[in-house]
Amino acid sequence: MAPWLQLCSFFFTVNACLNGSQLAVAAGGSGRARGADTCGWRGVGPASRNSGLHNITFRYDNCTTYLNPGGKHAIADAQNITISQYACHDQVAVTILWSPGALGIEFLKGFRVILEELKSEGRQCQQLILKDPKQLNSSFRRTGMESQPFLNMKFETDYFVKIVPFPSIKNESNYHPFFFRTRACDLLLQPDNLACKPFWKPRNLNISQHGSDMHVSFDHAPQNFGFRGFHVLYKLKHEGPFRRRTCRQDQNTETTSCLLQNVSPGDYIIELVDDSNTTRKAAQYVVKSVQSPWAGPIRAVAITVPLVVISAFATLFTVMCRKKQQENIYSHLDEESPESSTYAAALPRDRLRPQPKVFLCYSNKDGQNHMNVVQCFAYFLQDFCGCEVALDLWEDFSLCREGQREWAIQKIHESQFIIVVCSKGMKYFVDKKNFRHKGGSRGEAQGEFFLVAVAAIAEKLRQAKQSSSAALRKFIAVYFDYSCEGDVPCSLDLSTKYKLMDHLPELCAHLHSGEQEVLGQHPGHSSRRNYFRSKSGRSLYVAICNMHQFIDEEPDWFEKQFIPFQHPPVRYQEPVLEKFDSGLVLNDVISKPGPESDFCRKVEACVLGAAGPADSYSYLESQHVGLDQDTEAQPSCDSAPALQPLLHAVKAGSPSEMPRDSGIYDSSVPSSELSLPLMEGLSPDQIETSSLTESVSSSSGLGEEDPPTLPSKLLASGVSREHGCHSHTDELQALAPL
């Protein structure tokens, strides 16, 4: 403390001892009675209650009104300063009393009363202004002045007060302070008052969060404080009133805990108060949001369920659209007409007629798609054309494993008609076998089932030619529109040839040639319009579309699989087929007839050696072994010497040369999107044996035959012309994949 403050405090103590009676009188009796009268704030009051000069009044405020304290004259310090202490709301309140000095009293307009704590920066200020300003004289120098009460002061604390008159030429620092000390609590209040007991705050106030609950713990107050319980007041920082939670003190422990349940997240203000409201400690705590253990699964379900529902609706919509699209394809074929009703009425009677027996022969070297077409065609012949079809895929493989040749010869003998499905693989391997049938060693493909069957059929065909021309009607060679007539082996040239599905009516009429009187009753039974009347016809349509798609994706699939090249292939321009003929005419639209070569322009390269046929033949004999001697040699085409296997190159025809598309193979409907419908109306034996369609054909397991390796010197050999295929030497410069 500064020396001058210590000196002032000493003089104040001496003055208080000497003038104690005066201070007691100024206090106005008991502190409680005095406080009851003077704790209120007075706006306007008389200058003194004892002077009798009621014509002098002051207006009080808290120094908010700024008046220029500077003046032209000096005004003396206040005289006879006394302090009146009393209790207001269990705290100290003081009132300052003084008298004005005689010097400069005529210039006095008011006083400023400034109260400060000696060891603190806290400051309170009051301002007294004459309500009716007028000039005072020396007769007012004994008039007592009184300030408003100064409230909320501390017990036993040192203060000083300055009374500054204005306007004065002297500054505030030129006026002397008056020091005093507030009285003890037990002097102003009753000794048993709780406000006079020692002040206590808990040393530790711990706040923690457990889920959505808030846990508050603190240490106990000593027993002499007499606290019976505590209250926890809490609220959000920007909320209104406090919420209260009572905490019972446990005497057996050193701490007391309170649990605040279901507290919402936010920034909280927490206050700890005892039951007498004399102890208070505040703290702040941020409650964080807690994620429920069910929040994750609930969120996942909330996201998954709508997605599943949307996906289900999207899938259903897609399926319905595709079904509608397929229905649109067949809708114009399913219109009610006298023809369809006639067909529906005639179908049961057709079932009762004897069914012609048909033996179906095919090549298993053209891939699975071609085998699917063959199998669907067999179903179609049985279901739509009313035939009894013999197909190796439908036979019990375990029973005919060792007797395939005998089974084929038996079926050829028993059948009324023999249908050979010609394809590129059939042409290649049959002609290759015929070309080298004179070889002495066993070939790799000499035991293929279809080679044995074709050899037997060719022998029967040659015998039928010698007997009568009517016997040739038993032998039929068919090819689908992804092949051409040039794919018919030379050994089957004497057979009747049909292109499917263009010549479907003619094929059905051929199969039922002995029943012309029955077919004449319903001529539309086997028309191309009725092609789609049965599920087997639609299944055949899908299988043909899949084969077309496979050829479009890999035009050179056959060459890649069976004709390995030793030299890099010569660059050539791949043919572009704008459309392919579906073989169908919808809504009875008649297509313009044209030669077969307009659709399928094939070049048949009969590779011969530069020195002549004998040299090339001997070279091929050295490269590949011939078939077994048991296999009968078949005659080659009459138009050419012994031919090597033929390779076909497709020439892209001009738009005028291309046949008109009948529209049944709609490019807007990819064949990959169509499914094979189940076959109905089949006999139980055929349904049972049809389960073998996915197994290896009866010709598998007997080995495959590698095609001959063609040397580069034979690439520029002559070109042989055969029935149905035209040679173009200027377009085929080298052997290349299709």
Swiss-Prot record:
Principal localisation: Golgi
Q: Which residues form the signal peptide?
A: 1-16
Q: Which sequence ranges are listed under topological domain Extracellular? A: 17-299
Q: Name one GO biological process term.
A: negative regulation of epithelial to mesenchymal transition
UniProt keyword list: Cell membrane, Glycoprotein, Golgi apparatus, Membrane, Receptor, Signal, Transmembrane, Transmembrane helix
Q: Which residues form a coiled coil?
A: none
Looking at the UniProt entry, the stretches that span the membrane are 300-320
**What Gene Ontology molecular-function terms does this entry list?**
interleukin-17 receptor activity
How is the quaternary structure described? Self-associates. Interacts with FGFR2 and phosphorylated MAP2K1 or MAP2K2. Associates with a MAP2K1/2-MAPK1/3 complex. Interacts with FGFR1 and MAP3K7.
Protein name in UniProt: Interleukin-17 receptor D
